[in-house]
Curated annotation (Swiss-Prot):
The gene is rbfA. Its main location: cytoplasm. It comes from Methylibium petroleiphilum (strain ATCC BAA-1232 / LMG 22953 / PM1). GO terms for biological process: maturation of SSU-rRNA. This is Ribosome-binding factor A. The keyword Nucleus does not apply. Belongs to the RbfA family. GO terms for molecular function: ribosomal small subunit binding. Monomer. Binds 30S ribosomal subunits, but not 50S ribosomal subunits or 70S ribosomes. It comes from the Bacteria. One of several proteins that assist in the late maturation steps of the functional core of the 30S ribosomal subunit. Associates with free 30S ribosomal subunits (but not with 30S subunits that are part of 70S ribosomes or polysomes). Required for efficient processing of 16S rRNA. May interact with the 5'-terminal helix region of 16S rRNA. The keyword Nucleus does not apply.
């Protein structure tokens, strides 16, 4: 019996679909600890057993939101099972994504360095920029 060939980029497509569906399902949750949540990315294991769902929060405490989302993971997985056309629906693990915070911190550091450089250039009379 011939084995089926692997579908190229299937894991990425499944992760993208999970991201879209989970984002829609989170809006239906009634838990007040879940504020304005944005699903940033989803990483699915090769066997589709587990999925890390990275999220950011505009309003609310990230730790409380993560706890609430992880408590609702069973409900979300069950709802995904009804929506997705795959044999194995992964167990969802929610993690707060700090990428936005890090980007803001780096942006502030770059701005500070540029301001310091401009101030140093102004302090040196007769200095020209290269």
């Amino acid at each position: 019996m011939k084995h089926k060939r692997a579908i190229p980029n299937r894991g990425l497509r499944v992760a993208d679909q999970i991201q879209r569906d989970v984002a829609g399902l989170i809006r239906e949750l009634k838990d007040p600890r879940i504020g304005m949540v944005t699903i940033q990315a989803v990483e699915v294991t090769p066997d589709y057993a587990h999925a890390k769902v990275f999220f950011s929060v505009l309003i609310g405490d990230p730790a409380e939101c993560a706890a609430a989302l992880n408590e609702a993971a069973g409900y979300l997985r069950n709802s995904l099972f009804k929506r997705l056309q795959i044999h194995t629906v992964p167990t969802l693990h929610f993690q707060f994504d700090r990428t936005t915070e890090r980007a803001a911190d780096l942006n502030a550091l770059i701005h500070q360095a540029n301001a310091t450089r401009a101030k140093d250039a102004d302090d040196q009379p007769g200095a020209t920029e290269a």
